[in-house]
């Protein structure tokens, strides 16, 4: 199924509709924040034209009826605080779909999952309330458009890169990933790591959308602290970079976005947009970041007047103070949201919007439609050759009396696991990365030969995109994020019941575990929130504990490996093998559990493999039982 760029000239006729949808989104942002008195108006307002163009132009291939389709393009709101932007847009889109379904009864307008998956204007009244829509991006229920949970600075960027890698490695590089961020969030170090790695992996399907307005939270321009501009920030990393001078102009936004997204080549790309933080909100710059206008204040009503005059509507209580009772304030806000939605009384506009969303949704392929897709629809992770310790081959174990490090147990079971993938599924089970410590931590077993099965080798963007060991550098944070993004990418046509994708593994010193915690924490949340099946993230805490004492206390870390336990019950399994033969049984058993993260702590020095029978010890197979 070839993917061709939409015709820009044909799209231009729709820009008046896009402008109307964007104006409605602006009003939804303002009204929900006026009511809730919490949230982030500035960055939400500045990104409206980018989001409308992305979702209606065809640059992003997605289905509003089911955004979590396996081969849908992925959207990651790295600027996770800008959820009002997406909620407001979805409320407009879903209202058009609802009206067309009620008018025609045609199932093509029906949302998968019904009310539980439909974000309507009524839901805007629940912002930042318990059980309502979240203040930062969470991938669940009504907000499945978010491919992952985001909010902490930059955390979504490496995760998005991992998603792009999953599609590329599966032969589905035409499926794209879009990561929306501002230049403030972009200063986080994980962006530096992610940009290096995305270039090195040749992720031509990875797209940054950067909102550039020189403002953040504190009262100083970012240009006073950060040299250059987005063109330099991304060109210098080998990316394909294009800029938009007026980020509020639909023509310039759309033409530049399409030109950059559909360009050929394996360079990751960034499209940046020169915008005004707080555009149209009455307060611009840093002051618009995280505070709504006082409820029903004069400046709030001023932002409504322009819209009311433009579209000849009347807002309830216009110019008046906030109603005294909470119920009256809620009723007033609901009435005004309905007034915004009344623009969809224009049947031509409503039909255009709903039909355009359906048209784009219908373009999302199934696995059968995609030429060159490398994964079968069979879920190998249900294969007990991988998850039943009794099925592990004797060759992975060492004889009593041998001097071997625990990490060698990982090397053997890792090579065996991917040999099962080669033999049965013609693909690796696990894609691995390390912080320039692949051999040192023995995570390189995932790319090595096992028996008569040839290993998949090192990944190389030019010579071996089928490799199973990524050539990542000393980028612990982004390595963890990439592994989590990889493991969360379910390409199945039935993602709730079947997993088609990869497991991921990453390693560094156990004492540096804190560098990996942030992405793992969000992956744990995603696994809790999402109705879809996920893969596994295998967290190798290598060279762990005082056995690494020759590196001194800066490296052996008595307490920092405990970070792998900082998850809710049932979200992580920690493995601390006594000797190398315990690694295989314990790891296989853990991977067979319904737990998204498995943290394996291995040591570096050789230890003598015990003669368990002579010592009266139980079998190393008992390690599979856990503590």
Model-predicted regions and their roles:
Residues 87-91, 189-193, 217-223, 252-257, ...:
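Short acidic, glycine/serine/threonine-rich loops at helix termini
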Residues 95-107, 117-119, 123-126, 199-211, ...:
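A glycine-rich helix N-cap at a beta->alpha junction
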Residues 36-48, 75-81, 138-159, 181-186, ...:
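Active-site nucleophile and cofactor-binding loops and adjacent substrate-binding regions
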Residues 145, 149-269, 545-562:
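Thiamine diphosphate
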Residues 10, 14, 18, 25-30, ...:
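Cofactor-binding active-site loop characterized by glycine-rich and histidine/acidic residues
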């Amino acid at each position: 199924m070839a993917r061709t760029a939409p015709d820009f000239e044909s799209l231009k006729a729709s820009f008046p509709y896009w402008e109307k949808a964007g104006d409605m989104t602006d009003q939804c942002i303002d009204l929900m924040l006026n009511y809730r008195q919490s949230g982030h108006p500035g960055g939400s307002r500045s990104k409206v034209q980018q989001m409308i163009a992305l979702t209606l132009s065809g640059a992003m291939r997605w289905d509003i009826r089911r955004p979590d389709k396996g081969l849908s393009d992925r959207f990651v709101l790295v600027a996770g605080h800008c959820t009002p932007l997406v909620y407001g847009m979805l409320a407009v889109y879903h209202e058009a779909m609802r009206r067309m379904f009620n008018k025609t009864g045609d199932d093509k307008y029906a949302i998968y999952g019904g009310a539980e998956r439909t974000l309507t204007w009524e839901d805007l009244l629940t912002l930042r309330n318990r059980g309502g829509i979240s203040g930062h991006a969470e991938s669940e229920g009504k907000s499945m458009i978010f491919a992952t949970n985001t909010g902490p600075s930059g955390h979504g960027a490496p995760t998005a890169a991992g998603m792009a890698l999953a599609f590329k490695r599966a032969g589905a590089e035409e499926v794209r990933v879009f990561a929306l961020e501002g230049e403030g969030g972009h200063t986080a170090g994980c962006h530096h790591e992610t940009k290096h790695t995305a270039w090195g992996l040749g992720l031509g399907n990875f797209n940054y959308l950067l909102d550039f307005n020189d403002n953040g939270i504190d009262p100083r321009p970012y240009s006073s602290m950060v040299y250059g501009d987005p063109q330099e920030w991304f060109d210098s990393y080998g990316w394909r970079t294009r800029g938009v001078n007026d980020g509020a102009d639909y023509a310039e936004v759309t033409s530049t976005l399409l030109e950059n997204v559909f360009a050929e080549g394996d360079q990751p790309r960034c499209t940046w947009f020169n915008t005004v933080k707080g555009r149209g909100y009455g307060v611009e710059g840093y002051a618009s970041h995280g505070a709504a206008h006082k409820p029903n204040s004069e400046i709030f009503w001023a932002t409504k007047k322009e819209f009311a005059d433009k579209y000849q509507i009347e807002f309830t209580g216009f110019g008046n103070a906030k109603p005294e009772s909470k119920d009256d304030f809620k009723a007033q806000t609901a009435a005004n949201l309905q007034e915004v939605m009344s623009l969809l009384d224009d049947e031509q506009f409503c039909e255009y919007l709903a039909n355009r969303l359906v048209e784009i949704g219908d373009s999302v392929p199934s696995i059968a439609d995609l030429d060159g897709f490398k994964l079968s629809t069979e879920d190998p992770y249900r294969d007990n050759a991988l998850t039943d310790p009794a099925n592990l081959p004797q060759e992975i174990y060492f004889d009593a009396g041998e001097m071997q490090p625990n990490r060698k147990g990982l090397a053997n079971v890792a090579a065996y696991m991917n040999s099962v993938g080669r033999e049965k599924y013609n693909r690796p089970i696990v894609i691995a990365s390390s912080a320039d410590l692949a051999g040192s931590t023995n995570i390189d077993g995932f790319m090595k030969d096992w028996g008569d099965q040839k290993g998949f080798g090192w990944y190389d963007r030019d010579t071996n995109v089928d490799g199973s060991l990524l050539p990542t550098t000393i980028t612990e944070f982004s390595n963890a994020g990439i592994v989590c993004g990889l493991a969360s990418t379910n390409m199945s046509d039935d993602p709730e019941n079947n997993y088609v994708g990869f497991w991921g593994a990453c390693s560094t010193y156990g004492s540096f575990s804190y560098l990996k915690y942030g992405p793992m924490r969000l992956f744990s949340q995603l696994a809790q929130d999402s109705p879809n099946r996920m893969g596994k993230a295998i967290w190798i805490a290598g060279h762990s504990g005082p056995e690494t004492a020759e590196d001194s206390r800066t490296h052996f870390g008595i307490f920092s490996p405990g970070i792998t336990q900082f998850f809710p019950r049932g979200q992580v399994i920690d493995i601390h093998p006594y000797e190398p033969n315990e690694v295989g049984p314990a790891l296989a058993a853990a991977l067979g559990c319904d737990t998204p993260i498995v943290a394996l702590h291995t040591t570096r020095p050789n230890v003598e493999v015990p003669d368990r029978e002579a010592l009266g010890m139980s079998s190393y197979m008992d390690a599979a039982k856990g503590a």
